[in-house]
Amino acid sequence: TGSEGTIGCLDSDDCYTDAHGVDVDYLTMHVWIKNWNWFDPQRPEETLPAAKEKVRAYLARHVAIADSLDKPLVVEEFGCPRDKESYVPDSPVSIRDDYFKFLFDLIYENASNRGPLAGSNFWAWGGYGKPDQDRTYWGPGDDATGDPPQEPQGLYSIFASDATTLEIIQRQGQAMRAVKP
């Protein structure tokens, strides 16, 4: 019974309290700063600081819900486009790296203080895939880049060449493994 969080439930906490009984082991949530219009990749300096504050508040709300239900919480989908929303694998990722580090720090801080945050799953592993530069959306025979076919290919992809992002993800994995339950 995965959930996007309260945004996917008309901004109501009831999606958790009504659907997560004793047979559900943990809660999930998404954080989509671009899709939810909290962040504009064409104006990152203007919009990223406010987006981070919205993320902080949204996460705190879900932590409180998880606490009230005595369940762990996983940020199971989140992503941020490459700089200037480029889909090209070798384009810069400095904004995404900044955002990932911010979100990972919030998750780690909560987990290391015995809060309900138990982990996260970034969206999405693109690996060695390459988006077709002649069209935006996936087509038969195209590489898989992690993004669904109805979204621009490479929009949220983490490619094998994204060394700085992969380093941030690896550090978060190591930090979370060291957290004692």
Regions found by a protein language model. Give the residues of each.
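Extracellular glycoside hydrolase catalytic/binding regions
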Residues: T1-E109
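Aromatic-rich peripheral "rim/lid" segments of glycoside hydrolase catalytic domains that contact
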Residues: Y16-D23, A50, E85, P89-P181
